[in-house]
Amino acid sequence: FTARDIYNIAKKLGKTTEHVIQECGEVSIGYSSRIPLVHMVPIGLQRRCPLLRDDGRCSVHDCKPTACALFPVGRVASIEGVLDKNMEVTKDCVKVRYVLNDFNCGSAKRHNTIRSWLARFQIPEEDDFFLEWTVVTANLSVMVNKMENLHFPSRTLEMVWNIIFSLLYVNYDTGKEFMPQFELAAEQLNALCRKFWSLEAEETEDSSIDKPKMPDLL
């Protein structure tokens, strides 16, 4: 799930983003990214999607999660041109590619372009959200990995994870437009990363400076 997926589902079903996460997903810390990720959790003996109705139809078909809407097309973002690990990732560093996954459904009678396939669910080919999502999650991943490598206390890491989870996934009002809220959250989180790198640079210059603490970062 991305933040946009959760927001769209919550708005469609008349629920809060927190309720959608509780009912349809689980939160874990990414193995390599080291930031909170929200995964959909299958339910029942048949391990079916929690968004399916009893008749087998999707309850959020017109705003289904991006991964579902894109299938069998996949979307991959790569970070290029970042030579310094402390260099902030920006949208100019992100390159998006589309791939076609193996599939065995459909009649193959109709041909689609990437643009027309994405347009079915109002996903633009040049997707500003996806670029900004990639940027902020990449910057957060670098920051948290470095904090773990520097052996920050577990309580501090838990505080950071809670902040990331709340700002990135939860703190949205479905009565308001999504993008302005996401852009604000992304800027706050990118600012947190910049503050961490700034404090770390100061520590490198003066080894007598204590390890950055969360109150300093915030």
Task: Name the predicted role of every residue range.
Residues F1-L218:
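Short loop/turn segments that flank or connect secondary-structure elements
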